[in-house]
Amino acid sequence: MARVTVEDCIDKVDNRFELVLLAGHRARQISQGAQITVPRDNDKNPVIALREIADETLSPDDLKEDLIHSLQKHVEVDEPEADGEVIADQTGAAVAATETDDAEDNITFDRMTEEDLLAGIEGLVPPEKSDDY
């Protein structure tokens, strides 16, 4: 196949900068083991990515969505909003359950005086020095 030029792809993706981003993202996907949709023909991954875009075997919109998704660090999930009354009922039930749990569990912790703490610290043995540093 002849060399893939920007002119072959520019009618599929209007912006040249976006084309570079999409082709780079697709080339990284290919490097990570994604299936290619055109014959390899001994070409490198960026050329294959451009050929896939030029031949329209991949949708630029799908590539763009995948690129955006790969760059997101926090994905917000749309959850259906509950009615105000349902939320109030759930909150009241949670408060009542918490009060009941507190009364049943009454967790106690051991108390330590400052002198006991200092005596424990003095009794600690320092770790042996090693040549790993």
Curated annotation (Swiss-Prot):
GO biological process: DNA-templated transcription
Transmembrane parts of this sequence: none
Disulfide bridge map: none
One example GO MF annotation: DNA binding
Function in brief: Promotes RNA polymerase assembly. Latches the N- and C-terminal regions of the beta' subunit thereby facilitating its interaction with the beta and alpha subunits.
Assembly notes: The RNAP catalytic core consists of 2 alpha, 1 beta, 1 beta' and 1 omega subunit. When a sigma factor is associated with the core the holoenzyme is formed, which can initiate transcription.
Listed name of the protein: DNA-directed RNA polymerase subunit omega
Species this protein is from: Mesorhizobium japonicum (strain LMG 29417 / CECT 9101 / MAFF 303099) (Mesorhizobium loti (strain MAFF 303099))
GN (gene name): rpoZ
